[in-house]
Amino acid sequence: MSVCLAITKGIAVSSIGLYSGLLASASLITSTTPLEVLTGSLTPTLTTLKNAATALGAFASTFFCVSFFGAPPSLRHPYLLYGMLAAPLSSFVLGCASNYQSRKYSKVSKESSLFPEDSKPAASELSDSIIDLGEDNHASENTPRDGKPAATTVSKPAEALHTGPPIHTKNLIAATAIAIVGFVQAVIGVYGEGQFI
């Protein structure tokens, strides 16, 4: 194997490994972080991760392509083709899911804007009811002088805080799995050629 071919394969495998790691990091961040934080303070970080992953995926696919088509016919192994397709396939999965979810979200938001506020179903009153089984002096503090209990404000449940388009965690995990499988088979393929010995 020529030195140039070994270098291009090494760059391709390293790039697909970094690409898989970035997708895994993005999956972990989006699955463990609330939506408000993702759409607020983490947006620049996620944008940077997306741009880096796009660049690494394109870089890896290019070097896998150069390694496959630049090799003599006896060294054109299928793992180079599979590695070349891992990044575009995972990007395709994310692109289709994003397009589907954005169309679905815009359709739901259009339908909800057609109904006036009065015709929307009322929220359940059960989530607003609180029974305080604490001390009696707490109840006397909240009771005004006319004998009626004071109205208390209840914080909204966590589900009410999640607004905006849903995060595509399942699709991101599927794209990450595709990239990881591409990376693992590329490492096994390069190792099988004896490049690491």
From Swiss-Prot:
Q: Which residues form a coiled coil?
A: none
Q: Which domain of life is it from?
A: Eukaryota
Which InterPro entries does this UniProt record tie to the protein? ATG33
The organism named in the record is Saccharomyces cerevisiae (strain YJM789)
- Membrane topology listed for this record: Multi-pass membrane protein
Question: Sites of the modification Phosphoserine?
Answer: S127, S129
Kindly state which keywords UniProt assigns to this record, in alphabetical order: Autophagy, Membrane, Mitochondrion, Phosphoprotein, Transmembrane, Transmembrane helix
GO biological process per UniProt: autophagy of mitochondrion; macroautophagy
List the subcellular locations: Mitochondrion membrane
Similarity comment: family membership:
Belongs to the ATG33 family.
Q: Supply the name of the protein.
A: Autophagy-related protein 33
